[in-house]
Structure formats: structure tokens, C-alpha cells
Amino acid sequence: MKKRFNLRHALVLCKRNLIKLTRTPEQLIDVTLQPIIFLTLFLFVFGGAIAHGSRHEYLQFLLPGLIGQTIAMSSISIGQNMNADIAKGVFDRFRSLPIGRSVPLVGAVLADFFRYLLLCVIMVGFGYILGFRITTSPLLLLAALGISICFALSFAWVSLWVGMTVRTAGAVQGVMFLLIFPLSFGSNAFVQASTMPGWLQAFVNVNPLSHLVSAVRGLLLGGPVAAQIGWTFAWIIGLLVVFFPLAMRGYIRRT
């Protein structure tokens, strides 16, 4: 019964966060304009050089990589928003309510589901306009979007932990950039790992974003994906196991 009430309360706070998004739509820039800008930038500025002139081939390679990179980048905002809410005393009011301690954070993550879904749809749709083509099936497209969103939701707990740990919302962005940039550019999102030095390839091969990107590429373009999907879900579970309790501990300490 308690779990049922906690879920209901989390859904109520999810609705609260969605209402905030409708009132401040500029918060959606990172999941609407950012994917379009990144895809255009990498395809038309760097694509010719990286793919030796074949932008279409590079687009096929690039788009799954950018899905992974942009969902990681878009996770920054949830940590910033939670940090700002704590500074405003919003969570002091929540403490007076008969709700579970994890409910405010879970509600925020549930609301982010819709942001990540919007990001993935925009990325695939804009990619299609530019010439990206799925060579598998609509069912595998849904699987690719599903695994991407699951990874994003688990990675959001990293951002929440940072948001509970640092003092200001601006610091959240700085810390998350330091984390996401090595994961993004030290992965196979933009170039093949085989073109990198051996020491960097070792990092790429264990990078969670590399496993996600490889899984999405296989689901959208074909090829063996079972191992990469398995590694991706292992990372999803690992991130939740580690960062959910860390974020909760930070939340309890701050409030």
C-alpha cells in the first residue's frame, strides 16, 4: 500500500515538473535545439573531413552517436533544477508532507522521461530530413529509443547526485561537463575506435556511452547487438545501484 501511495505521489510531482516546463519552455532548448545544432555542426563542418567527403555515410554513423551524447548532456538540467529548488526552500515544504523521502527525486526523473523522448524523436526526425535511413525495422527503432531513454533515466541520477553535492546550480553544470566531455569524445560516438591510440581505445571499450552507441547503431542499422545491449543494461543497473542511494543521501543531508 505504501509503495502505491509513493508512486501516486511521485506522479503528482512529475506533473508539477511538467507544468513548470510548460511555463518555462526555454528549459526545453537542450532537448530541442541542441540536437539540431549538434547534428548540423558535426555533419556539415566536420563530416566531410572525417568521412573523406561522404557526408551520407558519416550521417549514418553519426546520428546514433549523437543520440548518446545529447541525452547525456541534457541530463545536466535535472541536477541544476534540483539544486535550485533546494536553494529556494521548495524541499523544506515537501518534508512537511506525508510522502516518501525518495518521491521528489523520483518525480523529477519521471518528468525527464518526456524530455528524453522528445530529444530522441527530434534527433531521428531531423536526421531523416538530412538523409538518415533506418535499415532494420520500426520495432528495432522503438527498441533503440527505449534503451536510449533507459540509459538517460539512469544517468539522470548522476546529475541528481551532483546537484545534491555542490552548492550552486552553476557548479552542477561545470562538474557535469567535466564528466560528460571525456565520456562523449572518448567514445565511438563520432569516429571509429580503431582510429584512436591504443591507450584511448582501452577507455573507449569500457565507456558506457560506447556500449549505448554501439547498441543503438546495431538496432538502427543492423549487425550484432546482443553483447552491446547486455553491457548497456549492465551500466544502467550499475548507475542506478550506485547513484540512486548517493543522490538520496545527498538529498537527505541537504534538506
Task: Describe every region a protein language model picked out.
Residues 20, 51-53, 133, 184-241:
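Membrane-interfacial helix-loop-helix junctions in multi-pass membrane proteins
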